[in-house]
């Protein structure tokens, strides 16, 4: 019997609003994924302050330890743990914010994470500019992703990713 999946990336994005999953629930999810041939867990809960509203700040030690544990546990279970950052709410598109974003990715890399995403969904204003998003992502690729031989290709979520949820007035 030959048994393999047809879909390369199989898993979930924890990218919703509301009460985030507990650490224990995340570990159970990863365990479930490993047992059922799911290979991807993208961590991006909108209510994780250090993922979104406090994206410029490092994780406090206790929360950093949980991220590290998730990355290690996922690897042990054959699951790619991808940590996402969501800077679009208040990014200023200057060198300081660009450098801060790369420094944040480096800090999460030091926790053992080897897969990263940048989310630009659910925002308005300057953060929605696709040219600026592309320039930032290209910079992250050049100075962070390509620097580390053990990091997977960068993922992203654009501002508008589903036309059925947008209006004809969207200028994106």
Regions found by a protein language model. Name each.
Residues 43-44, 84, 119-121, 157:
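Generic beta-strand/beta-sheet core signal
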Residues 16, 123-172:
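Catalytic-core regions of glycoside hydrolase
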Residues 74, 100-117, 121-128, 132, ...:
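Hydrophobic or amphipathic alpha-helical targeting/insertion segments
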Residues 1-104, 110-114:
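Feature activates predominantly on carbohydrate-active enzymes
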């Amino acid at each position: 019997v030959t048994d393999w999946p047809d879909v390369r990336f199989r898993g979930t994005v924890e990218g919703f609003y509301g009460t985030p999953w507990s650490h224990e629930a995340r570990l159970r999810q990863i365990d479930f994924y490993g047992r059922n041939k799911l290979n991807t867990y993208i961590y991006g809960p909108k209510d994780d302050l250090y993922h979104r509203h406090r994206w410029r700040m490092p994780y406090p030690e206790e929360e950093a330890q949980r991220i590290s544990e998730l990355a290690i546990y996922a690897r042990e279970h054959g699951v790619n743990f991808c940590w996402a950052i969501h800077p679009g709410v208040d990014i200023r598109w200057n060198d300081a914010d660009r450098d801060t974003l790369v420094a944040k990715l480096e800090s999460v890399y030091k926790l053992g994470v080897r897969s990263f995403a940048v989310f630009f969904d659910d925002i308005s204003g300057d953060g929605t500019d696709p040219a600026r998003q592309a320039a930032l992502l290209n910079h992250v690729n050049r100075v962070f992703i390509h620097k580390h031989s053990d990091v997977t290709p960068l993922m992203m979520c654009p501002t508008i990713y589903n036309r059925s949820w947008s209006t004809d007035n969207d200028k994106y």
